[in-house]
Amino acid sequence: MHRGDKPVNIEVAEPITVEVLDLDAQGIARLAPSEEEAAQDQSGKVIFIKGALPTELVTYTVTSDKSRFSKAKVREILKPAVFRAEPKCAAFGICGGCTMQHLDIRAQVAMKQRVLEDDLQHIAKVKSEEILCPMGGPTWEYRHRARLSAVNRSIKKGTVLIGFHEGKSGYVADMLACEILPKHVSDLLPEMRKLVMGLSIVDRMPQIEIAIGEPEDAQSDDPQKSKPVTALVFRNLKPLTTEDEQLLRAFADQHEVWIWLQPKGIETIAPFYPLTGKLCYRLPEFEIEMPFKPCDFTQVNHMMNRALVSRAIRLLEVQPTDRVLDLFCGIGNFTLPLARKAKQVLGIEGLESLTARAKSNAQHNGLSDKASFMQSDLFEVTSETVASWGGAERWLMDPPRKGAMDICKALAELHLQQSDLLPERIVYVSCNPKTLARDVEILCHQAGYRLSSAGIINMFPHTSHVESMVVFDRA
């Protein structure tokens, strides 16, 4: 327990009006200031209320109390918001996978747009010249990657739990379906429970990773070609017995899935049964097919990834004579479509395994002559590092949550030393608005760029995850 925490369970009958929503989808309300606070010109105590939405009048139960704020859960909604929605999932409110199913999808998008704009204004001290129209797609059954936890509760409950963790806890949610997973995978959750329960290593199989590839031909009359390819990676901390192996093979045959095993680190992931198969996704606009392995990083939302790539390349305005850098390139998700447009593209990636996959994908798509790749730690970058990459008219950056601070600082140094190496335009794809805003501050106030446009992509509906895209031009 953190110092200052006061775990309580106090029902508050006095109604309060919720003002805004935070990124954890908690309603934020504020008590009227006490006489002492008012005398010191201070505002009242902040209450974070789980399950409450802006504009709603609610009563609540305080669950944790600190000197400056309290946490609570909604007790009764006296006046619901017009944008309140009925959650579709039975595990909503318990499972930590989704936090916003009770909020209309349009309101979800508006909230994420506000988060992006607020962070740009308050952290970066920059206002975008243009706000891009938010991008959205299917709101259910969109997630093609997932990591599920498994816990044996056979002693107390007579079952195994398989699912996402409960919100901000180490407990696994008791879920028999998941509305954001494709239906054929959601329907497998009860069957996976039975499978794991029957294994001799039920206590030593803590995780199942799901990776789904696109069908070979979705329009085909052949069911084998029109079905998505589904891989399940079982994290087995003990060797399987012969009986365990038989159960896994029977499960794979019955449910038409591809089973992989991971006995130790990520480097030990290998196919178990069947031994052959192919996971891939496609970018039809660019005539690109991207094979991948279950352990490779890919976007979880195939439909929105197509829209993401299309918008990024359109905004980059690549010319046939351009040299382009793609930083944090992964398996080539942006690099290979860019190679269809540019004279030459260099993809740089921190992980050796993804760099190797990117090279393989370039060869698979006949683009090895236009797309090259190198492995480099992009969190240890100096101006000399950037200079060694050579000049490029266009850059695309798609960093992980920690952002690209070292790269931005290196560009700021080059702005003062060797500005001819700076790209004319940068498209930055972000999965964390706060680190994005930090990097925007560096590029706009220290590296000589202006923020031309910014917008969100609703890559993860019903979650608080904010995916965004911004464009920088040399000032």
UniProtKB/Swiss-Prot annotation:
Keywords: 4Fe-4S, Iron, Iron-sulfur, Metal-binding, Methyltransferase, rRNA processing, S-adenosyl-L-methionine, Transferase
Binding site for [4Fe-4S] cluster: C89, C95, C98, C178
Occurrences of domain TRAM (ranges): 1-76
One GO MF term attached to the UniProt entry: RNA binding
InterPro entries: 23S_rRNA_MeTrfase_RlmD (IPR001566), MeTrfase_TrmA_CS (IPR030391), NA-bd_OB-fold (IPR012340), SAM-dependent_MTases_sf (IPR029063), U5_MeTrfase_fam (IPR010280)
Keyword Nucleotide-binding among UniProt keywords: no
Disulfide bridges in this chain: none
PROSITE patterns from the UniProt entry: SAM_MT_RNA_M5U, TRMA_2
Stored Pfam families: tRNA_U5-meth_tr (PF05958)
Residues engaged in binding S-adenosyl-L-methionine: Q299, F328, N333, E349, D377, D398
Role noted for this protein: Catalyzes the formation of 5-methyl-uridine at position 1939 (m5U1939) in 23S rRNA.
Protein name: 23S rRNA (uracil(1939)-C(5))-methyltransferase RlmD
Organism listed in the record: Polynucleobacter necessarius subsp. necessarius (strain STIR1)
Gene: rlmD
